[in-house]
């Protein structure tokens, strides 16, 4: 059985020769279709072809069937094709069949089409029945269509046929051991190159003209070129050999070179998505888009990076990845000069300068600059949280939120400050931290004049003036100014402690508490008192310490009027009036007002004495007992009251005579 491929394009180079293929052994990296061969000029003449070829072209008198535009493969040849090539083959065959049906050709549905529609590999021939690739005789156009339909049918099928040939020409390569076939193919390339060169030269000569040239064929008028001299012989329809963008969209006026591109474009206006994925039900405008989508379900990644070996499921993703190695950023913003690897990233960035927010939420009316942001925001209304942590089961609405959360478990901090070396788990935290070094404070409070380096901090601060507490606990009704405080409070009800120390395994309800705790292991004390030089691991500890120097006691008991430096001390003091003892020992049932007192009491049962004197080696259950021991036995003092003012000093060891002399001088 012979397989015939008919390919032509009325607006392209001179018509192409019809090839038949008789099968031969196929090398592993070759395919079967030859390149197009010029046979007809625009006016239907046979151009500058050898006489032997013209004789061959006059012998075929067959009518067109689907087999004339079909290509079959053997099992061996089919295995040589990649995943993408197989789907491209299916796309072309189905589109060929659809176009022939739309033109009214009377023939039953071929078995090949039935197999393709059922997603079954196409039927193939045995390799024994296939001999060699040879150049066959072209079919006469007079016998292909009835006389009254020849012009319109031939024009349309050829226009579509060229688009299909362009697809296959990139997919399939010529393979032939026949010297005659190879010679004809070489002649084809030479003629086509000469044709393109001559056209470019003639268009360059006629470039000074500006009048629009049109070609009238029947009822249709199509623009051919806008840069031809109206007096030139090339302005005549039958002498113009190349047409630019013949196919125009009736809705928006956009022009296309190929009829198939116009059909795909029209689906944008209609919103039609005829190609549906059988796995997930997602619809696509083109079969090629569906084919690329199916790779997601199969997990296949046919496109590999030659430098690092990383695989991708699309060629575009591979191209974007390659720019990572080269560092190339060809797309530059005209406003700020920032460069990007892809044009899509540049377009997204430019929305920052324009302030445009084209994506609007239908539920609440909030607008966003990026479609991805709108998608994540929409999950607030739907309650959808598709991204779940495998370690703790917590779910998130965005993949980036899950990535940040996972770093809590792994302890990863990829963002490091170049000035002080401090690392952060989020890039936004690093950006905020850098303002400490630059001392930038762009955001000022209009009520008290206090400046802030971060806008979010100013927003939180202004709630102090308004006394707004918008975040309310659903369990007890307690209200908070900040959402993070409410979340931390809710964990007191649930008992959840999601933040774990990697060094000792201790867990915390609040991330801030974990950060301060980790400084115990690292010895880091970033907050230093400017008056006495004492350093602290937490900012709140420094704030409380400063009140020793200032004598400030802002936290006052409403019952007895006693004032305290710290709010936690006031809470503990209030329990004296209420008699509350919330901390109970599970061993003996004894209750305590303070959690630290319970911890010290538990060591009575366990016998643990973690506080050891460096001088004599004596150990104690509570740190206060060790402090008293040092004062009594070793004269180690931590604080002194001189001249009626209380000053904080670092612990020092002094002799008995030194203490007496200090007190005497006072």
Curated annotation (Swiss-Prot):
Among InterPro entries, the record links this protein to: KRAB, KRAB_dom_sf, Krueppel_C2H2_ZnFinger, Znf_C2H2_sf, Znf_C2H2_type
Localization, UniProt: Nucleus
Tell me which UniProt keywords the record has, alphabetically.
Answer: DNA-binding, Metal-binding, Nucleus, Repeat, Transcription, Transcription regulation, Zinc, Zinc-finger
Q: Which parts of this protein are zinc fingers (C2H2-type)? A: 247-269, 275-297, 303-325, 331-353, 359-381, 387-409, 415-437, 443-465, 471-493, 499-521, 527-549, 555-577, 583-605, 611-634
What's a Pfam family in this record?
Answer: zf-C2H2
What does the entry list under GO cellular component? nucleus
Recorded GO molecular functions are:
DNA-binding transcription factor activity, RNA polymerase II-specific; RNA polymerase II cis-regulatory region sequence-specific DNA binding; zinc ion binding
Which PROSITE patterns does this one have?
Answer: KRAB (PS50805), ZINC_FINGER_C2H2_1 (PS00028), ZINC_FINGER_C2H2_2 (PS50157)
Domain KRAB: start-end pairs:
64-135
Q: Which GO terms describe its biological process?
A: regulation of transcription by RNA polymerase II
* Family matches, as CDD domains: KRAB_A-box (cd07765)
Family in the record: Belongs to the krueppel C2H2-type zinc-finger protein family.
Q: What does this protein do?
A: May be involved in transcriptional regulation.
This chain belongs to which protein, by name? Answer: Zinc finger protein 311
According to its UniProt entry, this protein's organism is Homo sapiens
């Amino acid at each position: 059985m012979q397989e015939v491929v008919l390919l032509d394009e009325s607006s392209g180079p001179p018509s192409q020769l019809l090839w038949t293929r008789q099968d031969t052994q196929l090398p592993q990296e070759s395919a079967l279709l030859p390149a197009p061969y010029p046979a007809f000029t625009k006016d239907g003449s046979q151009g500058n072809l050898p006489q032997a070829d013209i004789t061959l072209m006059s012998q075929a008198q067959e009518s067109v069937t689907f087999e004339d535009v079909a290509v079959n493969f053997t099992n061996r040849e089919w295995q040589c094709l990649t995943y993408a090539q197989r789907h491209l083959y299916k796309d072309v065959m189905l589109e060929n069949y659809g176009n022939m049906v739309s033109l009214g050709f009377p023939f039953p549905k071929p078995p090949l089409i039935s197999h393709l529609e059922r997603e079954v590999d196409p039927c193939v021939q045995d390799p024994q029945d296939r001999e060699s690739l040879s150049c066959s005789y072209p079919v006469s156009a007079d016998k292909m269509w009835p006389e009254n339909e020849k012009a319109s049918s031939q024009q349309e099928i050829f226009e579509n046929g060229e688009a299909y040939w362009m697809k296959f020409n990139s997919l399939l390569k010529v393979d032939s051991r026949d010297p005659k076939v190879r010679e004809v193919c070489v002649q084809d390339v030479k003629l086509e190159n000469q044709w393109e060169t001559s056209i470019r030269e003639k268009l360059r000569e006629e470039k000074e003209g500006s009048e629009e040239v049109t070609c009238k064929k029947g009822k249709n008028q199509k623009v051919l070129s806008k840069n031809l001299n109206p007096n030139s012989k090339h302005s005549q329809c039958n002498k113009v050999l190349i047409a630019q963008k013949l196919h125009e969209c009736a809705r928006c006026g956009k022009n296309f070179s190929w009829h198939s591109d116009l059909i795909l474009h029209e689906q944008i206006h209609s919103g039609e998505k005829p190609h549906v994925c059988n796995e997930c039900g997602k619809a696509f405008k083109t079969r090629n888009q569906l084919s690329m989508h199916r790779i997601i379900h199969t997990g296949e990644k046919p496109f590999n990076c030659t430098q690092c070996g990383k695989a991708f499921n699309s060629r575009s993703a591979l191209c974007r990845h390659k720019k990572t190695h080269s560092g190339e950023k060809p797309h530059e913003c005209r406003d700020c000069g920032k460069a990007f690897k892809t044009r899509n990233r540049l377009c997204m960035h430019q929305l920052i300068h324009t302030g445009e927010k084209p994506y609007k939420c239908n539920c609440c009316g909030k607008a966003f600059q990026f479609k991805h942001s709108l998608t994540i925001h929409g999950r607030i209304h739907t309650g959808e949280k598709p991204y779940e942590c495998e370690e703790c089961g917590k779910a998130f609405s965005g993949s980036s939120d899950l990535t940040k959360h996972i770093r809590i478990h792994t302890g990863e901090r990829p963002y490091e400050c170049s000035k002080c070396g401090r690392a952060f788990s989020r890039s936004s935290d690093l950006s905020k931290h850098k303002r400490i070094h630059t001392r930038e404070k762009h955001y000022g409070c209009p009520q008290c004049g206090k400046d802030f380096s971060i806008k979010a901090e100013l927003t939180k601060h202004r709630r102090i003036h308004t006394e707004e507490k918008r975040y309310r606990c659903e369990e007890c009704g307690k209200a908070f100014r900040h959402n993070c405080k409410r979340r931390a409070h809710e964990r007191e009800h649930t008992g959840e402690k999601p933040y774990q120390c990697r060094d000792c395994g201790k867990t915390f309800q609040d991330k801030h508490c974990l950060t301060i705790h980790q400084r115990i292991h690292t010895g880091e004390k970033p907050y230093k008192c400017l008056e006495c030089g004492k350093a602290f691991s937490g900012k709140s500890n420094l704030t409380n310490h400063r009140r020793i120097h200032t004598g400030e006691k802002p936290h006052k008991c409403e019952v007895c009027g006693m004032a305290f430096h710290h709010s936690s001390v006031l809470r503990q003091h209030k329990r004296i009036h209420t008699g509350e003892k919330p901390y109970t020992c599970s061993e003996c049932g004894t209750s305590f007002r303070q959690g630290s007192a319970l911890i010290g009491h538990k060591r009575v049962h366990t016998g643990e004495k973690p506080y050891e004197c460096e001088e004599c080696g004596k150990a104690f259950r509570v740190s206060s007992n060790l402090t008293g021991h040092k004062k009594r036995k070793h004269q180690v003092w931590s604080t002194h009251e001189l001249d009626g003012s209380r000053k904080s000093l670092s612990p020092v060891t002094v002799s008995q005579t030194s203490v007496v002399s200090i007190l005497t001088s006072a």
